[in-house]
Amino acid sequence: MENTPLYDALTAFAAQNPLRLHMPGHKGKPLPGLDNLAAIDFTELPPTGNLFEGGGAIGEAQALWAELFRMDSCLFLTGGSTQGVLAALTLACQPGDTVLLDRGSHRSAYNALALLDLKPVYLDRPWLARAGVTGPISPERVEEQLTAHPEIKALCITSPTYYGVLSDLPALAEVMHRHGGVLVVDGAHGAHLPFLGDYGLSEADLLVASAHKTLPAPGQSALLFSNGAFSHADLRRAASIYGSSSPSYPMMAALDLCRAHMLEGGTKAYRRTAEEVARLRERFPALTEQDAPLDPTRLVLCAPDGYAAQEALEAQNVWPEMADGGHVVLIPTCADSRSDFARLEEALRQVALGPCPGYPAPTVPPEMALTPRQALFAPRKSLPLEQAEGQVAACQVAPYPPGVPVIAPGERVDKKSIAYLKQIGYNTLEDVSVAVL
């Protein structure tokens, strides 16, 4: 065969039997019913249906997901939750509207601000000093912002966060609906939660969930749900703007099979995973429910040096999802066996874990000088951080922690933000620069 560098690299790594504590949720184990993908890789034909026209077997499969999540409608996404967030904000807002945005939102939400020319009012989260992460969104803070900015049309938040922090979605929905607004939830990391209990996801008007992150489904497979005013036709129209006109049939079939698999035995496996994570949280320094409401399966280890802890795990062929200066984030799923957890526990005994460093709370956001749209589409250049003072950021400067942009697109880089970034060690990384106009 001709030279195949990517395929060779992937197969060589897989052959090393890495313990995959990262997404995708299938962990490299066979996906149910998908032994011969080529046999079901079709295009839009009368027997196979059309994702963006609705109906048929695709529509039936989507309706079963909607029923499972207790939502009115569901649309399969083959462009990941990024496609879903863009589509959801397209439905929730008209160009030029004002949106209340969780400042810790995924970059797809920031791109939606620019593409739709939305005006952001940023919503801060409380800083949990001992845990070294941001906490849940406060309904009281949302109420304050809606009173101060009655022009807000929608609230877009992330729940759960990368660190597994959950917000009170029923309370947030009540506040938004009382003010006539729309609740958009980026639940990319929470597709598994309905199999573990009621976490309020169905209170959202628009909900995005990444099956590939925490369920046995292939990369990029995700789901967009709606309630109330947003019909299935609305979902199809908005998602088709950002998705391929040739969506993958094997990927859509995998979503169908994933749901059936979870109902047949995956739920029991996920409950076992939650029990294993609870046990590890007791034995090793980690975020717990004493810090904040958490996804019961997200394992966030605490360490004096998160990057060193990550390297120590990787040296034992255990591969985390990510690390920051004080944490290592692991994503156990229903695909992880008891022997996988035993292997993880043995590896953790060789890692220096302990309280995370005392990171300061994020600074007050800088002045907004341009809209996100103006910032994204303007010419740009790169400057070292210390030379960027007074310039306008064209992209996020978002170190972990805190996991939220210290400087958002369109904001002016100021002394206070530079000092904070240096304080948390952002400038110690190689070749750090900020894009400016």
Regions found by a protein language model. Name each.
Residues 38-80, 104:
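Conserved N-terminal alpha-helix of the aminotransferase class I/II PLP-enzyme fold
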